[in-house]
Each structure stands twice: as C-alpha cells, then as structure tokens.
Amino acid sequence: MSYKQVIIIGAGLAGSEAAWQVASSGVPVKLVEMRPIKSTPAHHTSEFGELVCSNSFGALSPDRAAGLLQKELRIFNSLIVQTADKFAVPAGGALAVDRSKFSIALTEALSNHPLIEIKRFEQLDLPSKENITILATGPLTADELSYKIQAFTGIDACHFFDAASPIIYGDTIDQEIVFKASRYDKGDPAYFNCPMGKNDYINFRNELIKGEQVNLKDFEKESANFFEACLPIEEIARRGVDTMRYGPLKSIGLWNPKWGDLFDRENRLKKRPHAVVQLRKEDLEGKLLNMVGFQTNLKWSEQKRIFRLIPGLEKAEFVRFGVMHRNTFLESPKLLLPTLQFLKRENLFAAGQITGTEGYAAAAAGGLLAGINASLLAKGKKTVSFPDQSMIGSLMNFISNKNQILSNQQKNKFQPMPASFGLVPELIKRIKDKRLRYKAYQERSTEALNDFKNQLDSCFDKDHLLSKIY
C-alpha cells in the first residue's frame, strides 16, 4: 500500500530522527533543509544534525536523567543515539561524539533511504492543511517562517529569546532556613523564601557583579531588545546597591512565624530580613523550584558557586541553569497535545527545541514521537503518547497541554526544560536514597516502555517498524 508523503521541515536532530522513523515505517518523506542555500549564524556546514554547541549528549548512566533518556531512545532504535554510539569519543561517563563523523553519517543514512526525498530550500510558510507536516526548525528558525508560525500560533505563543531562571531540586534546599509564605499572606503560602541578612546580601551582590559571564554571539548582540524585556539579575545588581532589594529580592510583606509576633513593631524591625530570594514551584509537588527573577547570563559554573551563597541554598542541586540567548520556541503547553500534534491542526506536529525541550537527546525524543505519530496518522491510525512513567513521556507531558492540567504552569511563563527526574511521577513507595530512587525510576520506565513498544509494534508492519541502521 502506498501512503501520502509526510513533510518534515528542518534536518537537525529532531527532524532527522522524525524522518527516519516515518520512512522506517514504510511512509514516504520529504525532508526540507534550507542549508546550504541559507545558513544560520551558528551553523558551519550543510550536514544534517550538525551539533553547534557541545558535542556531548550528557551522562551515559541510566541513573542520570540524560542517561535514562538515551536508554529509552535505544529501545526504539533511535537513529540519533545509534549514530552517536557509533561515533562516540572518550568522555568519562558521558556520551560525546566526533561532530563531523556524526553529522556526515546522519546525512548519508537519510540520503540513502529509498523513502526519503531530500529538498534543499528555505521553507517560507507552513505547508497546506492537506499535508501531514512535522515542524522541526529548531531554535534558529529563519525569520520569514518564524513570522508565519507566530501568525498561526498567536503573537503570545511564540518566543524569540530565552531568558530563563535557574531551576533547583526542591529536596536540596535547607528547610531549617527556607520558609514558605506568600507576600502579605495572600492566599496559600505559594513561595519558598530564602532570607538574607545585610552582610549576606552585600557579599552576594559583590560576587554577582564579579561573576564571569557568557559571551553573547554577534547575532544576539545585534538584537537591541535582547535584555530590555528581562534584565539579567547581575545587571540589576550593577544598577545600584539596593536595586535588587527593591526588585526581585524585596523582603516587604514576607514573614516567618518562627521570628515571633509580626505585629510587634520592634520585633518586626529587628527580625525582618534585608532581602529575600523567592523560589516558586514548577510542579504541584514542589520537586522543582524556580528562582524567581534570576534570569542570568552568568556561566554555569559561576551560577552554581554564586547562587549557593544564598542562605538555604548552600547545597542546592540544579536541574537547569539560567540562560539568556536567541531561542525560537513555542508556548507549547498552550498549543500541543502530548502526541506533539497542534491542538488546532491535528496533522501538524512540532518536535525538538522549538517545542521547549533542551538537550540533544530530548530533541531526538521529540523527533521520535512526532515521527511515530505522523506515520500512524498517514496510515489512518490513532496517534499515541509515551507512558507517563518514562522520561520521554514525562518530558512530552511537560511541554504539552497535559502540563496545564497537571501543574500550575499556566500561571507561570513557560520555560524550556531538559530531561529531569523532577518531571517523572513519584514512586508509589517513597525511596529516600537518591541512587536507589533513580534506579527504581529506571526500572519502572523500562517495564512501561517494553509494554508500550509491544502495543506499538502491533500497529505497524514489523518488517518496517523502527528498523536498525547498521
């Protein structure tokens, strides 16, 4: 039986993975890549899946979030991860690759597939509604297509810069120091508050100002409004000794009952902190906490060093560090189903960094799911979502409308997220030991995915499904 061609825009990691999954299921693909006709400021070749930042896919061990994600992708014979395994270079406990050999091999694998048609041109608009399409254009989507995506999704649902605060694990804060409260006791105590004395504050500000920053790329410097909408915390600190105290670190209206009677003026003046750093829940359970107002351009090592000076965060572990860079991404929880289909157009999918995932393996995971579902749709079958217990499923839930249902994310600005154990559902039986807990997450994921894959296999011609590459 012949099927209508699926169009995939973008041959980065997500687009390449999606193309392979669709073609391997017996459905023809048109893979559109604008390079080398038109390049981006960050790319240097015309190869598919060019790694423009690090050459690392993160930790290999499945007791790490990135490692579990890689393991899950191997279960489904991911083109990206299999190619990365083949061209791995020594990197301790991480999966790192020879960039050139990796991208050349990807390009050859896709170019030689009989069901994949490669087209090199700049896509200026979304394909017609009759076409099953996967949008995988990445964080440097060309301007013309960006405008069309913005028109399709709505002006408030497409972002062009990523100014994100760090996120830390909730169980790594010092509960003896940090207290829960909302300003002026309005509503439930929604924030975790880190009080700072005057000396703490001055020392923190001095280190913040001295902290080493990431060098912006030329195309980021050229954007006049890059820092205007969302000032880095270190820039706020530079504007005056007390500027942070009257901005994101203001202490007014926050009180810890341990300090005594709030209405005793003398006690209040004596005990009120000089400044307060607030942490906001990213999920209902409080496993992930966002540092409110701490968007930053500091290097990651400096963020870890300086932010651990905050009382209560001395042993904080970071899920993700703050970033400020050019990054086209969607307000995905308002737009996407967990299947990566757009709510308003079921035959249009999005995958990769444009959906708000971070990391190479996460991009591949989005491509894998979008590719599987585009194949199912082409065959007139029902699309699927990955099990909640898996890292892939949890990550796709976070960037989809399921997030709106499961968390308070609809109240907060959506921020891109890497793979994290903070996203997966809690175990039925709580395990305190972190190493054993992560092992249990891994075992639960593997069991759920094996069952899921068996069910998925029945939807496809097994001679085609998710075929091996080498």
From Swiss-Prot:
EC assignment: 2.1.1.74
Molecular-function GO terms, alphabetical: flavin adenine dinucleotide binding; tRNA (uracil(54)-C5)-methyltransferase activity, 5,10-methylenetetrahydrofolate-dependent
Entry keyword set: Cytoplasm, FAD, Flavoprotein, Methyltransferase, NAD, NADP, Transferase, tRNA processing
Gene Ontology cellular component list: cytosol
Protein's UniProt name: Methylenetetrahydrofolate--tRNA-(uracil-5-)-methyltransferase TrmFO
Membership in a protein family: Belongs to the MnmG family. TrmFO subfamily.
HAMAP family in alphabetical order: TrmFO
Organism, scientific name: Prochlorococcus marinus (strain AS9601)
Catalytic activity of the protein: uridine(54) in tRNA + (6R)-5,10-methylene-5,6,7,8-tetrahydrofolate + NADH + H(+) = 5-methyluridine(54) in tRNA + (6S)-5,6,7,8-tetrahydrofolate + NAD(+); uridine(54) in tRNA + (6R)-5,10-methylene-5,6,7,8-tetrahydrofolate + NADPH + H(+) = 5-methyluridine(54) in tRNA + (6S)-5,6,7,8-tetrahydrofolate + NADP(+)
Localization, UniProt: Cytoplasm
Enzyme class: transferase
Binding site for FAD: 10-15
Superkingdom, natural source: Bacteria
Source lineage: Bacteria, Bacillati, Cyanobacteriota, Cyanophyceae, Synechococcales
Pfam families the UniProt entry points to: GIDA (PF01134)
GO biological process, one term: tRNA methylation
Function: Catalyzes the folate-dependent formation of 5-methyl-uridine at position 54 (M-5-U54) in all tRNAs.
Principal location class: cytoplasm
Cofactors (names): FAD
Keyword tRNA processing: yes
Gene behind the chain: trmFO
Ligase found in the keyword field: no
